Amino acid sequence: MGALPRPADSPPPSRSLALQDTSIAAPTIAEVARLAGVSTATVSRALTQPDKVKARTRERVLEAVAATGFIPNAQARNLRLQATRTVILLVRDISNPFYLEIYKGVEEAAIDAGYKVLMGDARDDDERILRYVDMVRERHADGLILMVGRFPEALARRSRLPPIVVALEMLPGLDLPTVKVDNHAAARAAVTHLARLGHRRIAHIAGPMPDPMSLDRRDGYLAGLADAGITADPDLVVEGDFGLAAGRAAIRTLDARGVDYSAIFAASDQMAVGAMGELRARGRNVPDDVSVVGFDDIVLAEAVEPQLTTIHQPRR
């Protein structure tokens, strides 16, 4: 027997199933207040300014919060306090794996303190740095951690700056809290290590100049040579930008200059790994023909063959 004809004005049968609304309304501050026998203002004070509420009252409020499952609106509270609970980590090159390791350490500390972290890419661009600083000034974030090699002159002239901390870099002339390693001493130690292996012709692949961190590592390289009684040769120093391609280009530059070298100290692991790749492409073995030392101790240092000897830089 066929199906009964459907009246012309009736809607087609639905193929979807109606879902029963099983959502439960979130508990409100009023419910907490009722259960605790206090006003909503007292509940708010007990949660945001507990030192201003009597211990017994605070205890009743917390018991009511637990019983109802009430979750305080952190966003609204932060708005009242003009706080975002957000920190920006601004790095010079977001593609460098070293900064991802730093981010992990910063985020771990931030989460423990109730903050979240956003990561920004400066790209050595003054305008981008200014925009990130203005984000903090306009209260889109509570503070800025700077890991860039420059500070725009326009910012340096400002009489008041938002909360800024400089990390692992050095920005001379600025009165800003700074957390950094001793780049000069670390570079000096790297060259001393190579000199003790018997090397006398030690090349240096430097970072971009006049970046303060690059200068520190370059000067540490020169100090290490002096300690070993080695005369510095300007032709053995090549400037790079901390990236892999710069390491490869540095080997091509050194070879084009026709200089002899048996060891290389690179101002970053990425440049060191790039140099190792170019040396292999030119038929030279690492470390039998040329010893290479990097700086940073990124994951890549362990991934290459042979493993890269490098200066460890703490991330946390």
Across the structure, where does each feature detected by a protein language model lie?
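Hydrophobic alpha-helical segments within soluble ligand-binding/sensing domains
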Residues: 177-204, 219, 223, 227, ...
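Short beta-strand segments enriched in small/hydrophobic residues
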Residues: 35, 40-45, 79-95, 193, ...
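N-terminal helix-turn-helix DNA-binding module of bacterial transcription factors
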Residues: 1-84
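Short acidic capping loops at alpha-helix termini that bridge into adjacent secondary structure
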Residues: 200-201, 232-236, 285-292
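Flexible loop/turn connectors
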Residues: 2, 252-316
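Alpha-helical recognition/docking segments in bacterial nutrient-uptake
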Residues: 1-24, 86-192, 196, 256-260
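Short, solvent-exposed amphipathic alpha-helices that sit
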Residues: 60, 98-112, 186-190, 212-231, ...
